[in-house]
């Protein structure tokens, strides 16, 4: 197998892990594209992306155009004469002229088993929907949103204990090896491309903070999935006495209740049992305003009065509950 000359385009830590795998592979990373440095922290100093930092550590040239629609940026890309471009969480749109520039085009690492969950938040949406599995798809990029031909897919069982944070870590481990395997197949011309079945496609829209407001009229099962999907961002929450209370961990209780949805049934060190539209949800970890996430046992030591049996956990600003 002849090694490929690769351009890598990516920005966050998830992308940097894939770049590391490419650096360690037999292929040659000839240039890295990443988003422009952004002001960060209290001092608002310009901060490099994790991908840029890794590239510089390995003496790989870094390019940071504000847009790839710019003709000068496109000429720079063409001059690199790359075999292929690998795109992982880059954050800039690649116009068709860019997709067509490398000899073998551009490939992308996507955090779902396509065509299910195209779009920005595949990990969170899979959890929220109650999917049994997820995975990584390596695909040939076209001008659509995650619509290109599939080159390689991996599978990962979603565990009851998984949150978006844990699934992210698992897929960040799975993706790099899948990418290197796919590149080997591309270099040897042994990797067949599979068209996506449009009838099975759906979209994973970016999460919003509004979606994370807890609606106690939903079932305990739905809320349990939601809380896991919104961990670590934007975190499921409700309002109580004008305070936003975040819920980090929960499970579906075997208890039953005829109380109105959002009513506290009982509270002890093992959890706070809340009636829902169907079933009982046990909350085990929460976060009070200005505090860090704590176990319910710790929270009840200081705020047991907020969670006495019969308390209504309302979700409207200003409700006194």
From Swiss-Prot:
InterPro entries: Fmt (IPR005794), Formyl_trans_C (IPR005793), Formyl_trans_C_sf (IPR037022), Formyl_transf_N (IPR002376), Formyl_transf_N_sf (IPR036477), Formyl_transferase-like_C_sf (IPR011034), GART_AS (IPR001555), Met-tRNA-FMT_C (IPR044135)
Signal peptide: none
SUPFAM superfamilies cross-referenced by the UniProt entry: FMT C-terminal domain-like, Formyltransferase
UniProt keyword Coiled coil present: no
CDD domains (alphabetical): FMT_core_Met-tRNA-FMT_N, Met_tRNA_FMT_C
Keywords in alphabetical order: Protein biosynthesis, Transferase
EC code: 2.1.2.9
Catalytic activity of the protein: L-methionyl-tRNA(fMet) + (6R)-10-formyltetrahydrofolate = N-formyl-L-methionyl-tRNA(fMet) + (6S)-5,6,7,8-tetrahydrofolate + H(+)
Residue positions binding (6S)-5,6,7,8-tetrahydrofolate: 112-115
Role played: Attaches a formyl group to the free amino group of methionyl-tRNA(fMet). The formyl group appears to play a dual role in the initiator identity of N-formylmethionyl-tRNA by promoting its recognition by IF2 and preventing the misappropriation of this tRNA by the elongation apparatus.
Family the UniProt entry places it in: Belongs to the Fmt family.
Record protein name field: Methionyl-tRNA formyltransferase
Source organism of the structure: Shewanella piezotolerans (strain WP3 / JCM 13877)
Phylogenetic placement of the source organism: Bacteria, Pseudomonadati, Pseudomonadota, Gammaproteobacteria, Alteromonadales
Gene for this chain: fmt
């Amino acid at each position: 197998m002849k090694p490929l000359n690769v351009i890598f385009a990516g920005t966050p830590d998830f992308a940097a892990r894939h770049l590391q795998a490419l650096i360690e592979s037999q292929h040659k990373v000839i240039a890295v594209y990443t988003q422009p440095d952004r002001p960060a922290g209290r001092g608002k100093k310009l901060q490099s992306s994790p991908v840029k930092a890794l590239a510089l550590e390995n003496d790989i040239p870094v390019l940071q155009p504000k847009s790839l629609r710019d003709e000068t940026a496109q000429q720079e890309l063409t001059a690199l004469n790359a075999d292929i471009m690998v795109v992982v969480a880059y954050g800039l749109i690649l116009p068709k002229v860019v997709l067509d520039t490398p000899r073998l085009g551009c490939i992308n690492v996507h955090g779902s088993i396509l065509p299910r969950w195209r779009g920005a938040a595949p990990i969170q949406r899979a959890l929220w929907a109650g999917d049994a599995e997820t995975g990584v798809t390596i695909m040939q990029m076209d001008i659509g949103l995650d619509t290109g031909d599939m080159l390689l897919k991996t599978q990962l069982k979603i565990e009851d204990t998984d949150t978006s944070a844990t699934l992210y870590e698992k897929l960040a481990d799975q993706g790099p090896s899948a990418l290197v395997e796919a590149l080997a197949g591309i270099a040897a011309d042994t990797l067949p491309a599979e068209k996506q079945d449009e009838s099975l496609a759906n979209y994973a829209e970016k999460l919003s903070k509004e979606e994370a407001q807890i609606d106690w009229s939903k079932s305990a099962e739905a809320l349990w999935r939601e809380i896991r999907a919104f961990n670590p961002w934007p975190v499921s929450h409700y309002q109580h006495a004008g305070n936003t209370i975040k819920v980090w961990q929960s499970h579906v209780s075997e208890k039953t209740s005829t109380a109105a949805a959002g009513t506290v049934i009982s509270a002890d060190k093992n959890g706070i049992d809340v009636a829902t539209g169907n079933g009982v949800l046990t909350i085990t970890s929460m976060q009070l305003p200005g505090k860090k996430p704590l176990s319910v046992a710790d929270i009840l030591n200081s705020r047991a009065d907020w969670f006495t049996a019969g308390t209504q956990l309302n979700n409207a600003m200003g409700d006194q509950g």
